[in-house]
Design a protein with these regions (language model features):
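Cytosolic ends of transmembrane helices, especially the final helix of ABC transmembrane type-1 domains
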Residues: 1-24
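General structural signal for alpha-helix termini and helix-helix connectors
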Residues: 3, 7, 30-31, 47, ...
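Pre-NBD coupling/linker segments of ABC/ABC-like ATPases
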Residues: 25-38
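ABC-type nucleotide-binding domain
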Residues: 38-203
């Protein structure tokens, strides 16, 4: 009976993963021709409206400016669209109404790869790999030295848990960081963002 339930769970997980993969493959290819110019990194939402493909409206007539060099915090209830705002700024999705600019440039007109170079993103559902703490953080900037990785890790307070582990920074954390707590996984995500050292951090 237990084996059957495990097989059922595996089938459900496989169907979920296939569904997510199909969503990615079916998504339209994003394009953008404008190269980045040195106009700062202010993020401006001007009367932005956004709804998911299901028709659910998430944002309606949203306007604000996140100034370069300042911390901008969005406060609201769970499900209020705070995460959606950061994803739209990074163009994970395209908005239907209004305008979003970074440094005066419309995000939909910027080459996606160039746009992403502006952002370090701390995901709530961080993806970790069956590797060491150091190597998981190094994904923030491939080619970074151990010293650079450790500096970013300590800035994110990863040493509070890493130094207590059997192999410290070289401890293997298991698939998706199963050996760590949720808070510890989040700190690795923050360390990655610090290591990338992009002009804008989205939390």
């Amino acid at each position: 009976m237990q084996g059957a339930l495990q097989n059922l769970a595996a089938v459900i997980a496989m169907r979920t993963n296939v569904g997510r993969m199909n969503e990615i493959l079916d998504a339209p290819l994003q394009t953008g021709s404008e190269q980045l110019t040195n106009q700062g990194c202010d993020i401006v939402f001007d009367h932005v409206g956004f709804a998911y493909n299901s028709g659910e409206t998430v944002l309606r007539d949203v306007s604000f400016t996140a100034k370069q060099g300042e911390v901008t915090a969005l406060v609201g209830p769970s499900g209020g669209g705070k995460t959606t705002v950061s994803r739209l700024a990074a163009r994970f999705w395209d908005y239907q109404k209004g305008s979003i600019t970074v440094g005066g440039m419309e995000v939909s007109q910027i080459d996606p790869e160039k746009l992403m170079s502006l952002y370090s993103i701390v995901f709530q559902d961080v993806t970790l790999f069956d590797n060491t703490i150091l190597e998981n953080i190094r994904l923030g900037r491939k080619g970074a030295t151990d010293e650079e990785v450790l500096a970013a890790a300590k800035l994110a307070n990863c040493e509070e848990f890493a130094e207590k582990l059997p192999d410290k920074w070289n401890t293997n954390i298991g698939e998706n960081g199963c050996a760590l707590s949720g808070g510890e996984r989040q700190r690795i995500s923050i360390a990655r963002a610090f290591l990338k050292d992009a002009p804008i951090i989205l939390l």
